[in-house]
């Protein structure tokens, strides 16, 4: 996937990977550190985060690997992370929005938002907005948003029941919020010249991570009939391969001209549906993201 000639492609470049202390994010960080990148990884817990950074330093020989503590569930937490990044590095070449959430029971964050919506949509919008000037100053730069092909399973209007108060099924809410992430990412890509900052989406594939281990047949009722097969595929696929796919989007010269694209598989660009490609839907997601970031913590929202 990453050619031998690309092994040193990231020397002198700085990458931030959210949720980089475990699972796919950790594996992505390992690959990019081996390619010579200065790597910043984030997580909620300091102990495991520092341990993860130390392990990557030992394995890669890259001393410029650092952990930053962050609460991605709140807008303020993402803003504080951006402050840490600005203080830690002079520029940012790649932002990998990898962290996400899937919760078996409904809960709300300190901002008053349903937690899946906060982690998978509001948080990435807030962080990307804060760090965009740093990316632009480092042009050509990249924003890689990790999503799930599960977004295709969400068929209702994506702008209804945002707080999931009418119905809460964890896998469905996850698909809903990932669809919103796809839409807002495409809206951002249209706003930025490709030679300045590219914005792409990647589905790294199913793999055996802490998130997938927490899933049950009740998580995604639409997959209940094939759940044993889904479980088998998850168990047989390691997060290492998924991390390589994300790292490919973050580093490979072979995708330097792409923006506003969704990647799957090897990974290769895949055509999205008319719904995802609809500029009106993308703009509605953009406005929604701006409203939720601005309104964080001011009141509880519904609908």
Residue locations for each model-derived region?
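C-terminal amphipathic/interface module of NAD(P)-dependent oxidoreductases
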Residues: 275-303
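Rossmann-fold NAD(P)H-dependent dehydrogenase/reductase core
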Residues: 1-215, 293-303
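A recurrent short beta-strand within the Rossmann-like NAD(P)-dependent oxidoreductase core
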Residues: 143, 199-201, 246, 260-263, ...
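Short acidic, glycine/proline-rich loop/turn micro-motifs
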Residues: 108-109, 272-276
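C-terminal helical subdomain
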Residues: 177, 227-270, 279-287
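A glycine/serine/threonine-rich, flexible loop-to-helix segment
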Residues: 208-230
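Short glycine/proline- and charge-enriched loop/turn segments
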Residues: 159-168, 220-228, 266-270
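Short active-site-adjacent structural elements
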Residues: 150, 270-272
């Amino acid at each position: 996937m990453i050619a031998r000639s690309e092994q040193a492609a990231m020397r002198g470049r700085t990458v931030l990977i959210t949720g980089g202390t475990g699972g796919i994010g950790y594996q992505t960080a390992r690959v990019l550190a081996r390619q010579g990148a200065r790597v910043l990884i984030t997580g909620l817990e300091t102990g495991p985060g520092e341990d993860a950074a130390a392990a990557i330093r030992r394995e890669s020989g890259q001393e410029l690997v650092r952990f930053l503590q962050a609460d991605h569930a709140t807008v303020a937490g993402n803003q504080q992370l951006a402050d840490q990044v600005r203080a830690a590095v002079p520029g940012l070449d790649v932002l990998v929005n990898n962290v996400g959430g899937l919760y078996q029971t409904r809960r709300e964050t300190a901002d008053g938002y349903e937690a899946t919506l906060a982690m998978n949509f509001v948080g990435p919008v807030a962080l990307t907005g804060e760090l965009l000037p740093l990316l632009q100053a480092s042009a050509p730069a990249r924003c890689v948003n990790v999503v799930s092909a599960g977004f295709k399973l969400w068929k209702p209007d994506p702008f209804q029941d945002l707080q999931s108060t009418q119905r809460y099924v964890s896998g469905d809410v996850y698909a809903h919020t990932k669809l919103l992430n796809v839409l807002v990412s495409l809206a951002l890509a249209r706003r930025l010249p490709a030679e300045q900052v590219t914005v792409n989406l990647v589905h790294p594939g199913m793999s055996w991570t802490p998130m997938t281990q927490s899933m049950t047949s009740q998580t995604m009722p639409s997959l209940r009939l094939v759940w044993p097969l889904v479980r088998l595929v998850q168990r047989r696929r390691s997060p290492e391969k998924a991390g390589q796919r994300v790292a490919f989007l973050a580093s490979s010269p072979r995708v330097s001209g792409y923006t506003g694209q969704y990647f799957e598989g090897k990974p290769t660009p895949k055509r999205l549906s008319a719904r995802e490609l609809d500029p009106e839907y993308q703009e509605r997601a953009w406005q929604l993201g701006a409203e939720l970031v601005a309104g964080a913590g001011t009141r509880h929202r519904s609908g």
